[in-house]
Amino acid sequence: MKIGIIGAMEEEVTLLRDKIENRQTITLGGCEIYTGQLNGTEIALLKSGIGKVAAALGATLLLERCKPDVIINTGSAGGLAPTLTVGDIVVSDEARYHDADVTAFGYEFGQLPGCPAGFKADDALIAAAESCIAKLNLNAVRGLIVSGDAFINGSVGLAKIRHNFPQAIAVEMEATAIAHVCHNFNVPFVVVRAISDVADQQSHLSFDEFLAVAAKQSSLMVETLVQKLAHG
């Protein structure tokens, strides 16, 4: 099995990249892909850049160039579920766009024409992630993760997301674009991220302060998940 891992930012990939054995770097389309072995398992780790276009471009290049069997999206996210605090883990069962609106033509809010309203994560990957969470004794929530090209740190943006997606557990800027590409390529995916902030008016301050905490937690989760997928 070859496992594809995608993070947007340097801070979100550096801990995993440093552990890759026989590492090679591919620079393509503004993205960097690091290939090699993580604890003996073949992986391809992508640093995509921030936002939906960068994530979709990077995911496409990763899938075409490296042919991974599954995709794990890692990194940080803003917490929406009331039980979440910094460092907690969120696992997607579905991903949706929070900034797409074609409702004038009868689509659901967040749905693009020709696409499902939401992109379902793979059940086996979800189960494997939850097994790792239990093993590591981490606090985690599974549910809907929403994505858009905005960092949510104000009451207006937050209220709009809560109105349109009251069940959403976390918000960030890449996961749904990655899920969209995986859907088109028929490649299983799951989003496993750590909370860096609670999406409120102070979230930009919390993000800067706690990004390293989120990166450490999400990297630990992904490393454990890779081992689980490779060895059971």
Curated annotation (Swiss-Prot):
Record GO biological process: L-methionine salvage from methylthioadenosine; L-methionine salvage from S-adenosylmethionine; purine deoxyribonucleoside catabolic process
Superkingdom assignment: Bacteria
Residues annotated as the enzyme's active site: E12, D197
InterPro entries with a match to the protein in the record: MTA_SAH_Nsdase, Nucleoside_phosphorylase_d, Nucleoside_phosphorylase_sf
Pfam hit, one: PNP_UDP_1
Purpose: Catalyzes the irreversible cleavage of the glycosidic bond in both 5'-methylthioadenosine (MTA) and S-adenosylhomocysteine (SAH/AdoHcy) to adenine and the corresponding thioribose, 5'-methylthioribose and S-ribosylhomocysteine, respectively. Also cleaves 5'-deoxyadenosine, a toxic by-product of radical S-adenosylmethionine (SAM) enzymes, into 5-deoxyribose and adenine. Thus, is required for in vivo function of the radical SAM enzymes biotin synthase and lipoic acid synthase, that are inhibited by 5'-deoxyadenosine accumulation.
Assigned protein family: Belongs to the PNP/UDP phosphorylase family. MtnN subfamily.
Protein name stated in the entry: 5'-methylthioadenosine/S-adenosylhomocysteine nucleosidase
Gene: mtnN
